[in-house]
Amino acid sequence: MSTWRASLGNTILVFCLKVFQNSRALFLRTFGLPFARYLNFILPSEFKMSLNGFGEHTRSASHAGSWYNANQRDLDRQLTKWLDNAGPRIGTARALISPHAGYSYCGETAAYAFKQVVSSAVERVFILGPSHVVALNGCAITTCSKYRTPLGDLIVDHKINEELRATRHFDLMDRRDEESEHSIEMQLPFIAKVMGSKRYTIVPVLVGSLPGSRQQTYGNIFAHYMEDPRNLFVISSDFCHWGERFSFSPYDRHSSIPIYEQITNMDKQGMSAIETLNPAAFNDYLKKTQNTICGRNPILIMLQAAEHFRISNNHTHEFRFLHYTQSNKVRSSVDSSVSYASGVLFVHPN
């Protein structure tokens, strides 16, 4: 009987461990910190767990081979070509907006923003991406220690994650949802490419809904980091998703202007609002147009942080969009398209 009980006990422990490994946030919410400490006490050393929720797992490049090239050499050549064709560097990016669709659609556009990254100035990259696969209230950070790309692994900055966690405004990503989400991953090969051999860390942040004053809350938190010129913010967002499959297809049926140009005009109104660096202007634009900009909340966090940062110092801030395109030129109501734009925040000392 004692052998049977021991076997059952081990089975339960292994089950709990697998639950923990798959979803640390869920485990800690369900079983609580005391039980996690108990497991840490009785498990062999190879199964020890980090009680702050951060572990030694590596997030795979789950969209490589489908959304972008999985071959290191071919991907590197592709990124090099796009970056070489993106024109001259006109400044040093403090933050940027980049699309997150398959590279065949948006890689060229993304390159215009990443061309403005000066690797020697950057030690840490914050990546704010919208959640497409799970309903999330607020923001969540990763429990993984590395993010894999075909160009090499990117190291997660757990020191910053612990600081963010201490604010009590950040949840932990579920690992299965994290693997499925593409908005952060699609920025990583470009980051790896432009940073090259420079030593740096990343801080992936998944952004959900931001009701009430939460835009300002997160903006104030990230303003502290945006003030530091060693930090780069990458904001992941596509622009208009137009068509019946997106449940969004407004256009003026009486206008002679093609639908794709009407979409362009709507997007560029939003881009102009972002370039003012006024969160209220962008919020008003979204309420007026209901434009399906999936990264609206990461963009709003950036705008709130930039506003707080701008008020607290004597620097001049400039946001400039550099490239815009659409996946398809919509000419009839049965067509569909997604818009892509890239832009950069420059900070100039006075």
UniProtKB/Swiss-Prot annotation:
Q: What happens when the gene is disrupted?
A: 7-38% increase in lifespan compared to wild-type animals. Increased nuclear accumulation of the transcription factor skn-1. Increased resistance to oxidative stress as indicated by an increase in the expression of genes related to the oxidative stress response and activation of the p38 MAPK pathway. Increased reactive oxygen species production. Knockout with bli-3 RNAi rescues the enhanced longevity and increased reactive oxygen species production defects. Knockout with rho-1 RNAi suppresses reactive oxygen species induction and longevity in the memo-1 mutant.
Task: Please name one Pfam family that this protein belongs to.
Answer: Memo
Which domain of life does the UniProt lineage start with? Answer: Eukaryota
Tissue-level expression: Expressed in neuronal and non-neuronal cells in the head and tail, pharyngeal cells, spermatheca, distal tip cells, anchor cell and the intestine.
Q: Which InterPro entries match?
A: MEMO1_fam
Assembly and partners are described as: Interacts with rho-1.
Member of which family?
Belongs to the MEMO1 family.
**Could you tell me what this protein does?**
Plays a role in the oxidative stress response and the maintenance of longevity by regulating the interaction between GTPase rho-1 and oxidase bli-3. In turn, this serves to modulate bli-3 activity and the control of reactive oxygen species production. May control cell migration by relaying extracellular chemotactic signals to the microtubule cytoskeleton.
What is this protein's name?
A: Protein memo-1 homolog
Q: Which gene encodes it?
A: memo-1
